[in-house]
Amino acid sequence: MKKFTKVVSLMLAAILMMALCTACGSDSKKDDSTITFGTNAEFPPFEYVTAKGVIGEFDGIDMAIAKQIGEDNGMEAKIENMEFDSLLLALENGQVDAVIAGMTITDEKKDAVDFSEPYYTAKQVMIVKEDSDIQKASDMADKKIVVLQGFTGETCVNEMGYKYESFKKGTEAIMELVNGKCDVVVIDSATAEKYVEDNEGLKIVEDNDAFEAEEYGIAVKKGNTELLDKINKSLDKMMEDGTISELSAKYAESSDAE
């Protein structure tokens, strides 16, 4: 889902340098009774704000997974909501213990942080109006394209060499399409399904040759093997007992994101 662009690549480099500079330092004692996850609650059905969520006002697939990770390890899961591009910096600074935000695992990000095993596989798709003539990615060449800032869709469209406009919120991007201000929105498949369900007159167009599958993982600070082991054990359990599949089906069917 979410992959960093050139500006954030510089931030990743800065995070890596910070990690190297502090590698020999000692961390202050942390509260073992809580685990704080950073997220960007603008990505239904994975994370969004609602009247009553599984963790305070936060709900979605990722939020339910975060809560279960906390419970499996005898900790209370807490959420810090922030801009997506700030998440890994918050992780490096110790503001959060882990990041769960539908984050795509990439080699570039693995240089700066450690990732859990993948817990979800997604791909990029195109949302268009039902009468659109866009049938494949190359048909976007002369169209007005909208993407989400910092997300994988932005990287893909940029690599294709197409011009685009980026928005921070998925709802804003979709309203551009609904109101006829753009021709196509490039976004993650799971989120696309939810937006199409909630907005009449839209459809999803797939192009498996243009968009490769991507895997989501939970990020922790480089070298934090103790926490990473706890997260992976919990994820293993949830994948084996079908919890993650059940959550995916539940939240794909319905979410009351505000």
What would you call each of these model-derived segments?
Residues 128-145:
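Flexible hinge/capping segments at coil-to-helix
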Residues 86, 103-111, 156, 183-213:
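A ligand-binding cleft/hinge motif common to bilobed small-molecule-binding domains
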